[in-house]
């Protein structure tokens, strides 16, 4: 009888671990996709050359689990197609919101202010 109970406990433990591993693999694939989208956005807006401060902009990007953006991207208006950038950022933000819900994620809930940007040495950067 004791051996039978031990076998059942062991089987339950193995099933629990197997199910837990499956759940941890899925977020990794989704997180890799999110990271790739972020890299594509950074690449799209990488030319930050500017001639004056008015050319430098920021755009909220991503979504914290409790609301608000998870980051900001700095870009040069004269070097970046703002409409295409906004579409890419929306795709990234919507996907991150989806993952927050899907995996029941939490975040720090701190408000992230947009960085103050300027044209420093001919490149848009945060002050």
Where are these regions (language model features)?
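Bacterial signal peptide processing site
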Residues: 20-22
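Mature extracytoplasmic domains of secretory-pathway proteins
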Residues: 57-94
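Short, charged low-complexity linear segments at domain edges
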Residues: 24-43, 97
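C-terminal motif of bacterial Sec signal peptides marking the signal peptidase cleavage site
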Residues: 15-18
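Sec-dependent signal peptide recognition
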Residues: 3-11
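Short flanking/linker segments adjacent to small metal-binding domains or redox-active Cys/His motifs
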Residues: 99-127
């Amino acid at each position: 009888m004791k051996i039978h109970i031990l076998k059942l406990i062991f089987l339950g433990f193995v099933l629990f671990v197997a199910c837990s591993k499956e759940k941890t693999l899925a977020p990794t694939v989704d997180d890799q996709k999110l990271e790739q989208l972020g890299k594509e956005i950074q690449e799209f807006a990488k030319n930050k050359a500017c001639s004056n401060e008015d050319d430098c902009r920021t755009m909220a990007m991503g979504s914290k689990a409790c609301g608000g953006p998870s980051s900001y991207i700095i870009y040069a208006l004269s070097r970046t197609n703002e409409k295409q950038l906004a579409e890419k950022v929306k795709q990234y933000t919507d996907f991150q919101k989806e993952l927050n819900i899907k995996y029941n994620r939490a975040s720090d809930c701190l408000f992230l202010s947009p960085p103050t940007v300027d044209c420093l040495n001919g490149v848009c950067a945060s002050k």
